[in-house]
Amino acid sequence: MAETILRLQNISKYYYSDTSVTQALRKINLEFSMGEFVAITGESGGGKSTLLNVISGMLPFDEGEMYFRGEPTFQYDDQDWEEYRRNKIGFVFQDYSLINHYTALDNILAALVIQGKDPESSKEEAMAYLEQVGLTEQAAQRASQLSSGQKQRLSIARALAKNTDIIVADEPTGNLDSETGEQIVEILERLSHEKLVIMVTHNYDQAEPYVTRRIRLHDGEVVTDVPVNKRDENVDQDHQNPSEGEIKSNSGEKTKKKHLENFFALKNIKMQKGYTGDGY
């Protein structure tokens, strides 16, 4: 049986304003396992993106507990959540969030450098990620020159380069035509055989042939949680190593910082104090 990697227990989330309090999530109880491709659906304002942002560590939850590989996260401080986002979650955004004046290859190298890898010795690895999404011929093109579908493929390749067990995708096909969108969903399905992929979508008809599970939210509550397409294959155990992505030693952090400085200096980008590469 596939390993449970995430468990949400009675998770609630509130949004506060000067005059009101809105409960965005209401006592959510869910478990997610490796090898799943989960579609989160529901009407606008139902809590889909809030749930995804809580899962990915982008938003704190207010009540309940979220367990990552059996360990509670309620006591995480800012540094713990930063490490979680950086080393545990691969992000695929609707707006791509690429560095537009970088080439496709350099966008992937940036993700590898943030992990402390040397850019020169990582080019072969970066090309391998581009190959997985069918972008080897576009490696030397700037991100700004790519089509919308190619940009989303590049966004997926960048998420792959983080080598995380979890990929979250927020409306990854929202800016794409139906044919290109289906290609993106197909790529995510292929990746989900060795990872957990969680996707928010308004177009469930497009996703239905590919996902293994559908969760539907209404007014912040789970109203549907059903399996869709069963899989019999075993998940690759290489992707179930609890120690992967642990916080590096001080010497490793120094090496990582040096690679970051060198890489971004070459690209004529001034690193802002405190830059951590969240989203990369």
Feature locations, PLM:
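The feature captures the beta-strand-to-loop junction immediately N-terminal to the Walker
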Residues: 41-43
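Conserved signature/switch motifs of ABC ATPase nucleotide-binding domains
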Residues: 86, 141-144, 162, 193
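Conserved ABC transporter NBD signature motif
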Residues: 64-72
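Short coil-to-helix segment of the ABC ATPase nucleotide-binding domain corresponding to the Q-loop/switch region
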Residues: 102-110
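Conserved ABC ATPase signature
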Residues: 142-146, 150-152
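Helix-to-loop junction immediately C-terminal to a conserved catalytic motif
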Residues: 56
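Conserved catalytic loops of ABC-family nucleotide-binding domains
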Residues: 187-199
